[in-house]
Amino acid sequence: MPSRRFWIWFSMPQKMALIFDHILPVPLAEQAAQNSVWRSRLEVHPGNHFAIIASSGRGKSTLVNIAYGIRHDYSGSYKIDGRAASGLSAIDWSLLRQSTYACVFQDLKLFPQLSALDNLKLKCDLGSSFSIQQATAMAERLGLAPYLDKPCGQLSMGQQQRLAVVRALCQPFQYLFLDEPTSHLDRANADLVIELVMEQAAAQHAAVMITGLDQDHRLPHSFQLLCV
């Protein structure tokens, strides 16, 4: 059970910094480059934009999963507003993910048996301040209107990626993590996704951390490239 101090901390609207200090995942200890994110200090503040562009197997998803609190098999220090991430309980992480962290996972983590619309409704019903009308409006911008009543498992991978992006945006956040969110999209749809992401992030003055295999989705110039 988290202390009352943690409950108050996660409930209060504030701008917190993330500090990755010489983080090194155990599986990558042998191959991490000296000039990479893994062997340096990285500070991320609301409003920052970072892009991690690298080939497969370099640890892009690992970094996202560490940041989001899914993986803990690393050396070094990861601090959230000065507090060690390793000391947070499951409930503490849950509170963070309700109001501070949003994420698009590489494997999307959608519910294939539910319709696309029900996937969005589920997110909106879980204490989110976003209405289903707002969610469907974003889905329509990404060309998903004709597919909202279809089971998610019947959608193409590109359609599922766009749905996962909309779902991630249906909550308050200060940090948005996107793990290869446009890998199955053509240029036009990728541009629509990035446009919506940046618009919503700007509205909340949020940081954006995005991973990709290449720079083909033409990220805005505000993004700083990082090496893993």
Name what the model sees in each region:
Residues I132-Y147:
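Conserved ABC ATPase "signature" region
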Residues V165:
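Hydrophobic anchor residue at the start of the ABC signature
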Residues D107, Q113-L126:
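Q-loop/switch helix immediately C-terminal to the Walker
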Residues Y68:
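Helix-to-loop junction immediately C-terminal to a conserved catalytic motif
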Residues L176-E180:
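Catalytic Walker B motif of ABC-type/P-loop ATPase nucleotide-binding domains
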Residues A85-A102:
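ABC ATPase NBD coupling module
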Residues P151-Q159:
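Conserved ABC ATPase signature
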